[in-house]
Amino acid sequence: MKFLQMMALAAYMTGSINAIAAGNPAAPPEHHIKTVWVIVMENQNWSAIKGSKFAPYINQTLLPQASHAEQYFNPPNNHPSLPNYIWIEAGKNFGILDDGTPLVNRQSSTQHLVTLLKNAPGGGVSWRAYEENISGKDCPLVNKYPYGVRHDPFVYFDDVTDRGNINSAYCIAHIRPFEELGRDLVNNSVAQYNFITPNVCNDMHDYCPPIRNQIKQGDTWLAKNLPQILNSQAYRNGGVVFITWDEAALADGPIGMIVLSPFAKGNGYAGSLRYDHGALLRTVEEIFGVTPYLGNAAQQSDLKDLFSVFP
């Protein structure tokens, strides 16, 4: 990790020097972060995760090599789950304060992240959502346990689902079974922006057999699945993984925000700045150079304090 960080910093400095040598000191260096994964877990305060004996992978493996935020919150009074997933995608909740399906909470707005990415200059930025326990044969607009549609923000937007069409080709192409992620990593065919939703057993939401401990179940899932990302070519060559929680179990947090990247400060760095989900959204927008900053992302700071090189 230390070697990768030194190489990233050297590359950043080289780009800056080359720009000056070319007679254009104001030209920004090329963005170093190329691929983003966002993993959203469920309903835990950071105080329940950090130091927990039920989360040995997070505490003993991830945190020592990662950066993390100590003051990351869900937006004020933004509960239950769905409003927070929508916020990560659009910087606001559109007045939604329930977990209703897209049948009752469909949005016609095109002002959300993946549409900005699709329409980005230069041919767009590719995106894909990996949802655990969907079939991949249709647009997953309804709950099919252990898949919870409220944890899949994209299907709430008409321009993703062709206005709630279960046979939407665009939706089916972009919202895929999590089980396909391993193949895509091996083939180096992951999208530039990837959103990962474990099922409601593995995201620390439900008590499920055989473990019957929410935190331990989620930690076990991360230990099993995260290494395939961290060992991938896409991660090593300019990747970042953001692991966060949708909302706190008590009040608004703090909740977890863990950043893993060759460009993160890492080494257990604990940032003290205050953020909410708008900061994550702004950070992703800055990485891919898309505007306008959506909703409260326009007022939030980005997460660059957690990086040694950004973006």
Listing of model-derived features with the role each one plays in the protein:
Residues 1-20:
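Fungal secretory targeting signals
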